[in-house]
């Protein structure tokens, strides 16, 4: 019984900061506003423009893709609000992992943190193989044919392994790692140069494409009576929005670089919204250009812009687009390789995975061990695995992290916070209104527990709601009754959360309309997760199982937070801010 109690206290302990200790870092703070804005743009700008646009236009949304990109951008913005608040309040490497550690405790933080390196490795491998395929296609598949001729095939098409070892993608990831290892400022300058070149290419595409615009591609009806603008109906536009959402994945790299940003309290929120605003504008402009140039049913799915200009005889612009695609994919890869070791460093620095991975070089101030080990592993994944078999896993890992960050905002907002410099006096954050049933019981729980339970209830309700729509359960009378009960539960939980008092902590940015906006973000993320395949969920649980073995055999005993909490009372009452019981008395 004592052992169970000890384990429970260990897995629920939260990351705490004393005074300004959240600003302490072994890394070098050298990145400014434009550096990290371009870092986020580099992560978001690439495959979303040059590859994804054609697929969504042709198969899902038609010209209404402009609304798909707008809706997806708004959905991404909901999560970005939460990241911006945490980035301003706690500018630490680790991103969602660190924020979950603060809000929900060590075990959930480890689970989220364990998915982040895999997310980056799969994403980087997919981008590297796309870069390799795009470049090889310009050479008429010379590299592929030569490799197969020399080494043979690894497996049959459609298997878990690639049909041939992609040596070019392996070398490309290793090259990016060398750039990253030189230092954050050098890699930021390289990335910024590529972003500027890519934006120039995109403007060339837009200006040149408008010259061939035909508004008949947007108006009128198709031969079978469908709207030219909404050929797949509203459902198609919404389906396209779900696909386009993943074009915005990348703004969280700002939070990953939090320990290397100058003036992070102001810079991170501004860069977050600036990058999303710029990329949303570019997505809408380029998709408008494409659908005005070519009827939606004639858009090429693999190389939409290059083929559109090729059909018009504009070979010069076609080659510029091909170069722009390589630049955009290089952006994706540089920023992805930049973020990967920093996500690992954050967990290692907290003692949850092997401490030697947190080693920072004295000269360049980068986590060199994490760079070497994980980029090498990343390069091997790109070399031999079929990325299409793994890429859907990228979606669930990202949405999983986004959900916990939104929930962590709620937990943190309803905790008491210091009202003086030394943290000896606390405000009334987290106090319950008198009308809340069993008020004394809820207030006797450790800080944030009641809100955490409320968030868990909301997530469960949202998943059930998504299940009823995905399976068609809502079409039956008993399904409609369950929706009614579920809706009532959501209302009651929201009322319970609203019955808590928010803290008065002042920061450079706070999520507006709490708790409604974070809860809306949770709803969107949960619905998208619920529509992923069963196989994807199985892979997630298998990966989590491997991570939990590492945590319970190593991390739980070497956690840095365990050394701060020396008594059961400390552990029980732990919160993000110390001295939570020294609240001021209202007058």
Predicted ranges, named:
Residues 1-587:
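Alpha-helical transmembrane bundle of multi-pass secondary transport proteins
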């Amino acid at each position: 019984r004592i052992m169970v109690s000890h384990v429970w206290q260990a897995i629920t302990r939260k990351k705490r900061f004393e005074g300004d200790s959240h600003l302490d870092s072994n890394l070098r703070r050298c990145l400014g506003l434009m550096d990290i804005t371009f870092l986020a743009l580099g992560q978001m700008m690439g495959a979303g423009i040059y590859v994804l646009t054609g697929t969504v236009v042709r198969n899902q949304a038609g010209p209404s893709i402009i609304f798909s990109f707008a809706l997806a951008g708004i959905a991404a913005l909901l999560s970005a609000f939460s990241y911006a608040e945490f980035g301003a309040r706690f500018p630490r490497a680790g991103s969602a992992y660190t924020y979950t550690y603060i809000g929900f405790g060590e075990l959930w933080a480890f689970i989220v943190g364990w998915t982040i390196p895999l997310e980056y490795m799969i994403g980087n491998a997919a981008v590297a193989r796309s870069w390799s395929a795009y470049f090889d296609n310009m050479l008429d598949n010379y590299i592929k044919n030569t490799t197969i001729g020399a080494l043979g095939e690894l497996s049959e098409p459609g298997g878990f392994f690639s049909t041939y070892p992609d040596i070019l993608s392996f070398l490309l990831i290793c090259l990016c790692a060398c750039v990253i290892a030189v230092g954050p400022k050098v890699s930021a300058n390289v990335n910024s140069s590529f972003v500027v070149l890519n934006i120039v290419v995109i403007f060339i595409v837009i200006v040149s494409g408008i010259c061939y615009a035909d508004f008949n591609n947007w108006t009128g009806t198709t031969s079978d009576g469908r709207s030219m603008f909404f050929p797949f109906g509203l459902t198609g536009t919404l389906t396209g929005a779900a696909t386009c959402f993943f074009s915005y994945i990348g703004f969280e790299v700002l939070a990953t670089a939090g320990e290397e940003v100058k003036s992070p309290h102001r810079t991170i929120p501004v860069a977050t919204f600036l990058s999303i605003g710029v990329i949303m504008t570019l997505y809408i402009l380029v998709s408008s250009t494409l659908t005005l140039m070519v009827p939606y049913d004639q858009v090429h799915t693999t190389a939409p812009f290059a083929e559109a200009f090729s059909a018009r005889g504009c070979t010069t612009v076609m080659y510029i687009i091909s170069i722009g695609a390589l630049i955009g994919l290089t952006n994706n890869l540089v920023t992805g390789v930049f973020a990967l070791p920093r996500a690992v460093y954050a967990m290692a620095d907290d003692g949850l995975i092997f401490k030697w991975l947190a080693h920072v070089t004295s000269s360049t101030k980068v986590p060199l061990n994490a760079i070497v080990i994980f980029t090498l592993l990343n390069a091997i994944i790109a070399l031999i695995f079929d990325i299409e078999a793994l890429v859907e896993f990228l979606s669930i890992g990202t949405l999983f992290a986004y959900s916990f960050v939104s929930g962590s905002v709620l937990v943190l907002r309803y905790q008491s916070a210091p009202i003086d410099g030394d943290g000896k006096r606390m405000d009334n954050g987290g106090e319950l209104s008198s009308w809340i049933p069993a008020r004394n019981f809820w207030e006797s729980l450790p800080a944030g527990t009641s809100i955490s339970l409320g968030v868990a209830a909301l997530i469960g309700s949202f998943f059930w709601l998504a299940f009823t729509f995905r399976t068609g359960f809502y079409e039956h009378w008993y399904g409609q009754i369950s929706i009614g009960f579920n809706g009532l539960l959501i209302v009651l939980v929201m009322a319970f959360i609203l019955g808590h008092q928010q803290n008065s902590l002042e920061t450079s940015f706070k999520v507006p309309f709490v708790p409604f906006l974070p809860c809306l973000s949770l709803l969107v993320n949960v619905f998208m997760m619920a529509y992923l395949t069963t196989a994807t969920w199985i892979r997630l649980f298998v990966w989590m199982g491997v991570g939990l073995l590492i945590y319970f055999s190593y991390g739980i005993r070497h956690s840095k937070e365990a050394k701060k909490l020396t008594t059961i009372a400390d552990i029980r009452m732990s919160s993000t801010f110390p001295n939570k019981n020294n609240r001021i008395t209202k007058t």
